[in-house]
Amino acid sequence: MNIRPLHDRVIVRRTQEEKTTESGLIIPDSATEKPSKGEILAIGNGKINDNGDVIALDVKVGDQVLFGQYAGNEIKVDGETLLVVREDDIVAIIE
């Protein structure tokens, strides 16, 4: 299924963090928080300002980003859980 977000929204796939500690202990899913890092899969056309002009987004498909832990709405696409996030909820691009 193809999905294209509207306006200033982006589709993000969460990046899984390591589930073992440096000493080799395995951390169960119930003890870990949802990761706040992910990869941009799709972007909208941009934010519309008060004059009706479209302002392009700063992020692009493929960018690795950091976002708020509770940002966005989870959706299921082809059995995969993805996030729909506003660009304002993205705090950094990882370079």
UniProtKB/Swiss-Prot annotation:
Keyword vocabulary terms for this entry: Chaperone, Cytoplasm
Listed name of the protein: Co-chaperonin GroES
Pfam families: Cpn10 (PF00166)
Organism: Ruthia magnifica subsp. Calyptogena magnifica
SUPFAM superfamilies: GroES-like
Any Gene Ontology CC annotation: cytoplasm
Protein task: Together with the chaperonin GroEL, plays an essential role in assisting protein folding. The GroEL-GroES system forms a nano-cage that allows encapsulation of the non-native substrate proteins and provides a physical environment optimized to promote and accelerate protein folding. GroES binds to the apical surface of the GroEL ring, thereby capping the opening of the GroEL channel.
Keyword Cytoplasm set for record: yes
Parts forming coiled coils: none
InterPro entries in the cross-refs: Chaperonin_GroES, Chaperonin_GroES_sf, Chaprnonin_Cpn10_CS, GroES-like_sf
Position of the signal peptide: none
Family classification: Belongs to the GroES chaperonin family.
PROSITE patterns named among the record's database cross-references: CHAPERONINS_CPN10
Subcellular location: Cytoplasm
SMART domains noted in UniProt: Cpn10
